A protein has these predicted regions:
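C-terminal transmembrane helical hairpin of 12-TM major facilitator-type secondary transporters
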Residues: 273-324
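Helix-loop-helix hairpin linking two adjacent transmembrane segments in secondary transporters
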Residues: 123, 132-179
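Cytoplasmic helix-loop-helix junction between adjacent transmembrane helices
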Residues: 98-135
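Residue-level signature of mid-helix packing/kink "hotspots" within the transmembrane helices
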Residues: 21, 49-57, 140-141, 254-262, ...
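Conserved MFS/SLC helix-loop-helix module at the cytosolic interface between two early adjacent transmembrane helices
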Residues: 54-90
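C-terminal membrane-cytosol helix-exit motif in multi-pass small-molecule transporters
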Residues: 164-191, 384-389
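Extracytoplasmic gate region of multi-pass secondary transporters
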Residues: 23-24, 208-254
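Helix-to-loop junctions at the C-terminal end of transmembrane segments
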Residues: 55-67, 261-272, 362-363
Length: 395
């Protein structure tokens, strides 16, 4: 049974991030139903991310001090219930409340989830985080497809399925968590026995280099969250597809991550996380620029090119996912929960603060022009990656 504990945490991650992916996938429906502007749609994303972004580091800090792994179950339950309620509300204001609560659930889940997976990984933390990331990538990949299929066929009430899944996995986690923690303690002891010299060294926090990593996280987060929010709208408004095809495009974007997040973890273990982070940004930067130019191409090649670029961006995001988490936890070895709250939670949410700004620019000019403003963030991230140092050389 013990060997399945990491997969149980990963399953919880999948359900939690499935809930986070519902709102962007259904933005075209909400825009139509409530007559929203793109700026208002952006504020829905902001509601889903702002409070969560503020809570992530705080909850991570509390996690380091108090160690409450059952928050993994509580966070998943809150996200799932809030997502289900989106199918039953009748106003834009109610949607804002549900979106906010779903974001809070995410902020509760991620620090403790990443912290326990770090311990369960033992000496192969990149692989462990790659496994954990599969859950998140699967959730973001299939959540939009599932939500779109429900909302555009049987109706928005079908979102209650997310609540049912959340209740089941949260109950199982709550009951098994004492055993999972005991198993993690056994792994900690085994690692200390195998590496007594490393275990004897006092843990240190390298805030300077974590700050540089945080700049990279911001550059990635801004791009990731805006793409996540507006890809369905980009497909329907700029490329002339149906809403279902817009949801499918979002699924394609995240599907590539299911495999590549795991590969990124393995590559990080082999070559070091810094090299993989730099490679990610080198791929992401030109791909983001090219995506904004797709509507200018002929209809014959427009859609194939759009999907190809989307896959490249998905690859770039996915391979850096685990290395960013592991590097952050290594730089802040004394504060793994806090580091996880920044690298995993905030990296998925804080970029949503920019979504209303991009939405406003899209209303004023065009969506491709608004998305072009994301490219400078990646340039800053790439430059910052050149300033990172291997944690082994800092000891």
């Amino acid at each position: 049974m013990q060997k399945y504990y990491p997969y149980l945490i990963t399953l919880s991650h999948m359900i939690n991030d499935s809930c986070q992916s519902v709102l962007p996938a259904l933005l075209p429906l909400f825009i139509y139903t409530y007559g929203l502007s793109l700026e208002q749609a952006g504020f829905l994303i902001l509601a889903n991310t702002a409070l969560s972004s503020l809570l992530q580091p705080l909850l991570g800090y509390i996690s380091d001090k108090l160690n409450q792994p059952r928050l993994i179950a509580a966070g998943t339950l809150l996200s799932a219930c809030s997502t289900g309620m989106m199918g039953f509300v009748s106003s834009y204001e109610s949607l804002l409340v549900c979106a906010t609560l779903a974001g809070v659930g995410s902020s509760i889940f991620h620090p403790e989830g990443a912290k326990i997976m770090n311990r369960l990984g033992g000496g192969k933390k990149g692989k462990a985080m790659g496994t954990f990331a599969i859950g998140g990538s699967s959730g973001f990949a299939f959540g939009p497809l599932f939500a779109g299929a429900i909302a555009y066929t049987v109706g928005a009430h079908g979102l209650a399925a997310f609540t049912v899944a959340g209740i089941i996995i949260s109950t199982v986690l709550f009951l098994l968590m004492p055993r999972i923690v005991a198993h993690a303690q056994t792994i900690d002891q085994a690692v200390a026995t195998e590496n007594p010299t490393v275990a004897a060294q006092p843990l240190k926090n390298y805030w300077k280099y974590f700050g540089i990593l945080f700049i990279i996280i911001l550059s990635q987060s801004v791009n990731f969250r805006v793409i996540n929010a507006f890809i369905p709208v980009f497909w329907t408004h700029e490329l002339g597809t149906s809403p279902e095809q817009g949801s499918f495009a979002l699924t394609v974007f995240f599907s590539i991550g299911i495999f590549m997040t795991y590969i990124g973890g393995l590559l990080g273990d082999k070559y070091g996380p810094i090299k993989i982070i730099r490679l990610s940004l080198l791929i992401w930067l030109p791909s983001m620029f090219l995506l904004t130019q797709v509507p200018e191409f002929s209809v014959t090649i427009m859609m194939p090119l759009a999907y190809l670029i989307l896959l490249m961006i998905g690859d770039a995001k996915a391979i850096s996912y685990s290395p960013v988490i592991v590097l952050g936890q290594t730089y802040l070895a004394k504060s793994i929960g806090f580091a996880s709250g920044i690298t995993l939670g905030v990296s998925q949410t804080i970029g949503g603060i920019i979504a209303p700004v991009v939405g406003n620019l899209a209303d004023t000019y065009s969506l491709p022009a608004a998305m072009m403003t994301l490219v400078p963030f990646l340039i800053v991230g790439l430059v910052a990656s050149l300033l990172l140092k291997d944690p082994k050389k800092l000891q």
